[in-house]
Amino acid sequence: MSGIDLEKIKEETIAALNELLEAASLKAGDILVLGCSTSEVSGGVIGKASNEEAGRTIVSALLSVLEPKGIFLAVQGCEHINRALVIEKESQEKYGFEEVSVVPALHAGGAASLAAYNLFKSPVMIEHVRAHAGIDIGDTEIGMHVKFVQVPVRLKTKYIGSARLTALKSRPKLIGGERAVYEKVL
């Protein structure tokens, strides 16, 4: 037994995801990146108490919402695999991401990336992704994986279990000078 309320973790995860989806206006084919410390979710210190049940619960909850919408999930691993990500082969091929050779493990990748590797239909590992939005559970630092320009999204859901929750969306760069127009003129 993990000592955490997995049903509550599932509910918090889905609530946070739905808030982000509304704010980020993601569409089919877009990518959402997850960074997740199940150690933090369980009340421990990041990297010290990986929890397989929590990882499986969180990834399954995200997939239950994202898959019907055609949104791809990329799951960041920990520093021990250089923050490589698990992603579906379909997404890797669509975006031309370079595949790398590593398989996530509980203490080298983490419980969430291990869960994704086991739950995805055709998982591959990549080194970098340019996701359209992201959820960070437990301060894992996902900014490097969200495309420029990253915009923080303040969610009503502040925690998943004991882990702090942050989220990002992205927008196109605003370029030009004083004469630039940023809204479409029809």
Swiss-Prot record:
- Similarity remark: Belongs to the UPF0340 family.
What is the official name of this protein in its record?
Answer: UPF0340 protein TDE_1278
Family annotation (HAMAP family): UPF0340
Disulphide connectivity of cysteines = none
Superkingdom = Bacteria
Q: Which SUPFAM superfamilies match?
A: TTHA0583/YokD-like (SSF110710)
